Regions:
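Flexible "arm" and connector segments at domain edges
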Residues: 10-121
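Feature marks short, highly hydrophobic, charge-poor N-terminal signal-anchor/signal peptide-like helices
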Residues: 1-12
Length: 121
């Protein structure tokens, strides 16, 4: 086996590992979405919107506590996760992942434009 053959095999092995990692990640994401869908179906959209509001309030409190030094980063991250789970359910209900992503891209681009204008002053 030549050195080039070895490198070619190594590249294929690395590519295969990347594919396996990506497939594993997709499966985990799919299982998470199935769970979120099951929760949404069980409780219904009205109850889950109320739960989203509750989780947002808890996130605000955790954010205040984190900024003030009276609450931990771990608690703040937990509340972020709670809100993200609820937001994922909303996107599932409205079949709106693509639309939400589009709006997010627009808002990030707009804010970057604002930052650029601020820096030019």
């Amino acid at each position: 086996m030549t050195f080039n053959d070895f490198i070619e095999i190594l590249i294929y092995a690395i590519a295969l590992e990347v594919i396996i990692i990506n497939v594993h990640s997709l499966i985990k994401d799919y299982k998470l979405r199935l769970g979120e869908r099951a929760i949404l179906n069980h409780y219904g959209i009205t109850e889950q919107v109320s739960k989203l509001k509750e989780e947002c309030r808890e996130l605000i409190e955790a954010a205040d506590g984190y900024i003030n030094g009276t609450d931990s980063k771990a608690h703040f991250l937990e509340e972020i996760a709670d809100v993200e789970v609820m937001l994922d359910q909303m996107k599932l209900h409205f079949n709106a992942q693509d639309k939400v992503d589009e709006i997010k891209r627009f808002k990030v681009k707009r804010q970057l434009g604002r930052i650029e204008r601020e820096e030019q002053r």
